[in-house]
Amino acid sequence: MADLVTVVKKTEEEWRAVLSPEQFRILRQKGTETPGTEEYDKFFEEGIFSCIGCKTPLYKSTTKFDAGCGWPAFFEGLPGAINRAPDPDGRRTEITCAVCDGHLGHVHKGEGYSTPTDERLCVNSVSINFNPAKPSSIT
């Protein structure tokens, strides 16, 4: 049986009211930020990264790694939090928030990173927010 997810749907105007122009461009218009320009690329504190649009938890900090690509990289998302779909160009796989359908970035496979999944979920920093761990809450 599939997980039940409460979907967040908003009009373009409602999204514009709660997101910055750059967040809107990336989450709602499937944009990409300039590599190395945002806060979470070299950020390695313990906690949870959530969707900036709907606050859904997406990634544990323990799955983040330094891929040297200029964007935050994770080797997996939280179960049921991320959707994957082929890009129209057929070359990449887009990742979106399972709750609000916000564009997060792309997944790349088989690049040889020594991670459990051999995947790099390349995420735009402005599409996520960091929530620090409480003592003994991250495993």
From Swiss-Prot:
Its EC number is 1.8.4.12. Residues 12-133 form the MsrB domain. Keywords: Acetylation, Cytoplasm, Disulfide bond, Electron transport, Metal-binding, Oxidoreductase, Redox-active center, Transport, Zinc. Belongs to the MsrB Met sulfoxide reductase family. Pfam families: SelR. The modification N-acetylalanine is found at residue 2. GO terms for cellular component: cytosol. This is Peptide methionine sulfoxide reductase B4. Binds 1 zinc ion per subunit. It is found in: Cytoplasm, Cytosol. It comes from the Eukaryota. Zn(2+) binds at residues 51, 54, 97, 100. Catalyzes the reduction of methionine sulfoxide (MetSO) to methionine in proteins. Plays a protective role against oxidative stress by restoring activity to proteins that have been inactivated by methionine oxidation. MSRB family specifically reduces the MetSO R-enantiomer. NCBIfam families: peptide-methionine (R)-S-oxide reductase MsrB (TIGR00357). GO terms for molecular function: metal ion binding; peptide-methionine (R)-S-oxide reductase activity. Disulfide bonds join 69-122. It comes from Arabidopsis thaliana. The gene is MSRB4. The keyword Zinc applies.
